[in-house]
Curated annotation (Swiss-Prot):
Pathway(s) where this gene product acts: Pyrimidine metabolism; UMP biosynthesis via de novo pathway; UMP from orotate: step 2/2
Alphabetized GO MF terms: orotidine-5'-phosphate decarboxylase activity
Gene Ontology cellular component list: cytosol
EC category name: lyase
Positions of transmembrane segments: none
Assembly mode: Homodimer.
Catalysed reaction equations from the record: orotidine 5'-phosphate + H(+) = UMP + CO2
Name of the molecule in the record: Orotidine 5'-phosphate decarboxylase
Length: 234
């Protein structure tokens, strides 16, 4: 069986996030806690989710000097989450430091969380790269390069769009995790994300794991939407 779809809990408070999850009681879930929710609630929300037997992707996208990132990862390692991330743009030294901090901070006898690197945000377009960031390479070239750096740094995978997943597996390793946000059911709004795809297309492209937010959290019947996505994905 593939990894479960990750539900992005993009809510401003723990109360709203936990209320949203009530209809899912008894359903095995993998959820994502991002900056908004974690900065509001802190580790308390993680404990509440673990009580519901949720697996957790703590999506904080660390990006700072290596020493700071290492110390931060050392602290995150004790929180008992399953997946964490950094920005690949921080470079190899920073990514290696993140991994070291995670390994040294993971309590004895426990598996360390998987760690992945963000390549290019799904809101990024090639036009933006050229006009604002002065990057002349193609978007796919930069994603593959960031992926190679993450792999060389010992990380478990990357965050990318569905459209780069196959190329990453071909250039790096079929076992390298590709975790892809920007997943929508057909006819759903894309909002601020530019590089989006359906669960079925993600499956075709060999994606390791999908992250789904609004197609579930904004659905009239979230549990039904989740099972529709699960059916397409499996």
């Amino acid at each position: 069986m593939k990894h479960l779809p990750i539900i992005a809990l993009d809510f401003p408070s723990g109360q709203e996030a936990l209320a949203f999850l009530e209809p899912f009681e008894g359903t095995p879930l993998f959820v994502k806690v991002g900056m908004e929710l974690f900065y509001q609630e802190g580790p308390v929300i993680l404990e509440a989710l673990k009580e519901k037997n949720c697996r957790i992707f703590l999506d904080l996208k660390l990006h700072d000097i290596p020493t700071t990132v290492k110390k931060a990862m050392n602290r995150l390692a004790v929180l008992g989450v399953d997946l964490v991330n950094v920005h690949a743009a921080g470079g190899k030294q920073m990514m290696q430091a993140a991994l070291e901090g995670l390994e040294s901070g993971t309590p004895a006898g426990q598996k360390r969380p998987d760690i992945i690197a963000v390549t290019q945000l799904t809101s990024t377009s090639e036009d933006m790269m050229r006009s604002e960031l002065l990057i002349d390479r193609s978007l796919q070239e930069t994603v593959i390069r960031y992926g190679q750096l993450a792999y060389e740094s010992g990380l478990d995978g990357v965050v990318c769009s569905v459209h780069e997943s196959k190329a990453l597996h071909e250039h790096i390793s079929p076992d390298f995790l590709t975790v892809t946000p920007g997943i929508r059911l057909l006819n759903d709004q894309t909002d601020d994300q530019k590089r989006v795809a359906t669960p079925a297309y993600a499956k075709e492209q060999g994606v390791s794991q999908i992250v789904v937010g609004r197609s579930i959290t904004k659905a009239d019947k979230p549990l039904e939407a989740y099972h529709q996505i699960l059916k397409e994905w499996e």
